[in-house]
Amino acid sequence: VKFYEGDVRDEALLRKIFAENEIDAVIHFAGLKAVGESVAQPWRYYDNNLNSTLVLTKVMEEVGCKKIIFSSSATVYSGDNEMPLRETSKTGNCTNPYGWTKYMTEQILSGMAFADKEWSIVLLRYFNPIGAHISGRIGEDPRGIPNNLMPYITQVAIGRREFLSVYGNDYDTHDGTGVRDYIH
C-alpha cells in the first residue's frame, strides 16, 4: 500500500496520486470533525471541509473517476425531526459550522450527481464514529478534553479519569438520561 502525506486541497498532489495509481473510487474521510472547535474556528472548518471536497471532485472529474463515498454526519439532520431518525428525515438547519460543512458537502455532491448521471455517490450519515488500531498507535486517545463520548469512556477504562459524568435528566426516556446506540 502506498502512503501519501499531504492536504486534500493540494491539487498537484491529487493529480500525482491519480496519475501514479489506478483508482476506481474514493472514500472521502478527510475533514475536521470537532463540533466545539468548529464554533470557535468556523472559517477553518469551511475552508478545510468544503475546499477539500471541491478540489478532490475537480481532480476526480478530470481523470474520469466518478465514484465517491462521503463520510458525512448525523449532524446534517434538522433538530425538529421525530425520533428515531430515518434516512428520509429532514436535513439542514444545522446547529454548528461542522454540521453545515457536512450538509453543504452533501449538497455539492448531490448536485454533481444530478448534473452528471455518471457520478455514483454514497453519503454515510452516522453518529460519533470511533475506532483504533490494536497497536494503540492510531485511534481515539485525546490528550486534552475529548470531543465525544467514547474517549471519555476509554479514559475511565484505563484509569485516566475516575468516573464518567452523564449530563441531562430531561430526555424522553424512562430515567430521563440520553440513549445512544452503538454498533461494533
Predicted regions and their residues:
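Conserved NAD(P)H cofactor-binding loop of Rossmann-fold oxidoreductase domains
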Residues: 30-33, 72-73
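Receiver (REC) domain switch-region micro-motif
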Residues: 26, 68
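Catalytic helix-loop patch of NAD(P)-dependent Rossmann-fold dehydrogenases
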Residues: 40-58, 62, 66-67, 76-128, ...
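Conserved Rossmann-like nucleotide-binding pocket used by diverse enzymes
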Residues: 4, 19, 46, 122, ...
